[in-house]
Amino acid sequence: CALPIYGFNPHHLQLADACEFFIGQGCKVGLGGHLMGQKVTDQVAEMRSLPAGIDQRSPARHPDWLGPDDLALKINEIREATDGQIPIQLKLGAARVYDDVRMAVKTDPDSIYIDGMEGSTGAGPHLATEETGIPGIAAIRQARKALDDLGMSGKISLVYAGGIRNGGDVAKAIALGADAIAIGHSSMMALNCNKDI
């Protein structure tokens, strides 16, 4: 749920299929975003109430959230605004996976996404996206163990994202404990992202 300066409107949630709280991303854990001006098209500028063509930076964390208690309040607010009709997802970058999943469980999401370093972003510092992060294969096992230890397997879904490129990657993620996978970059490239089709 973005800041109001990025055009967030709680009424839009009534139209949503789900609400994802973006806590982190595997290829830039703990860092904010950097959206290059060339990607701030007129359409993006209008949607986010930003000037077109100007670089945009986003903070590493939402300024309204200081910890899991604040996030739990926001999740409850979203559930109330949607009469509990849309699933709540938390997206975590693979860092301190076991501890982060245990903390995320306290916010009562429907699913937790673990994003490994193999994923990509169009809004991160080059050094971070190329040289940092935890491989997703290791992250899946840690996340599953955290859910198992808390007795939350089957109650909170574990979704893996980050570098899924083919059926073999899907099979490995499921075998290691993911309930589902999410594909971002690969599907965007298949659709010729950011270009007229």
Per-segment meaning from a language model:
Residues 62-197:
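Glycine-rich phosphate/ribose-binding loops and adjacent secondary-structure elements
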